[in-house]
């Protein structure tokens, strides 16, 4: 069965999702997923140009053009390009036979708003961000076993939660987490200013390419949604840094059981080669952020940075906050599509 997908919001994540899915399909994975339509407020000529040319991912190898004013042609693939401004309920998902909507505008993250996609004829909605009042938040490899097909509005959490989740799961399963604090050293995003200017967050008001910008992250608290046993036990913040992609999570946790550096690294390696294969990757090489750009894993564990004092452990994991997350988005569409 083909899983027909509509994408609402063809920005950084929407376009990365398209490219990640195309890469997976070329490798023989998730070949039953078809993107049939995208919707964005931006004109379609601009969308086609930004899909073809990408400052991080480079040029798309296929030719990209417009057919008429409502179809983007990518190689021999045609995608309906909508410009519906009235909100999810006004989208023609029913007429287009869309099964799953990827909601990636960053606007309709509340379930009441996202429900408009269901009213418009879609069967499932996946929000590519932390959400409110959603039926379930899923981090693949951590709690995807909780999806039973009855949930219609699903959050794929954040890129940082997708990195932190596997780390926290392994630590908690093997040694127990009493409490912990995390920092994500995160690439800048569109929610920051290129130059100093007004912003509701006065730190993010400052020039993104010139500063290390401390700001909030909900990733640590969101862990409680996917690992309920850790609810209220983790907290942290983000440091936005002047790079376009490639981020890293630093977690310091008090463990219930004492463990050595070797114990922790062995547990992470076993998980990366076993139940979390494809989600968690184990590195013992001395890598830097550019080394993990376009790596499809959610979390790339850096064994050389593990530290332990008594029962306090520090673990570090890298992630491509765009590409890794977009690959999980494609995998979540596949999981949800199987229940249709």
UniProtKB/Swiss-Prot annotation:
Keywords: Cytoplasm, Glycolysis, Isopeptide bond, NAD, Nucleotide-binding, Oxidoreductase, Ubl conjugation. It catalyses: D-glyceraldehyde 3-phosphate + phosphate + NAD(+) = (2R)-3-phospho-glyceroyl phosphate + NADH + H(+). It is an enzyme of class 1 (oxidoreductase). Pathway: Carbohydrate degradation; glycolysis; pyruvate from D-glyceraldehyde 3-phosphate: step 1/5. The record marks 186 as: Activates thiol group during catalysis. NAD(+) binds at residues 12-13, 40, 85, 128, 321. It comes from the Bacteria. It is found in: Cytoplasm. The active site is at residue 159. The keyword Nucleotide-binding applies. Its EC number is 1.2.1.12. GO terms for molecular function: glyceraldehyde-3-phosphate dehydrogenase (NAD+) (phosphorylating) activity; NAD binding; NADP binding. GO terms for cellular component: cytoplasm. Belongs to the glyceraldehyde-3-phosphate dehydrogenase family. PANTHER family: GLYCERALDEHYDE-3-PHOSPHATE DEHYDROGENASE 2. This is Glyceraldehyde-3-phosphate dehydrogenase. It comes from Mycolicibacterium smegmatis (strain ATCC 700084 / mc(2)155).
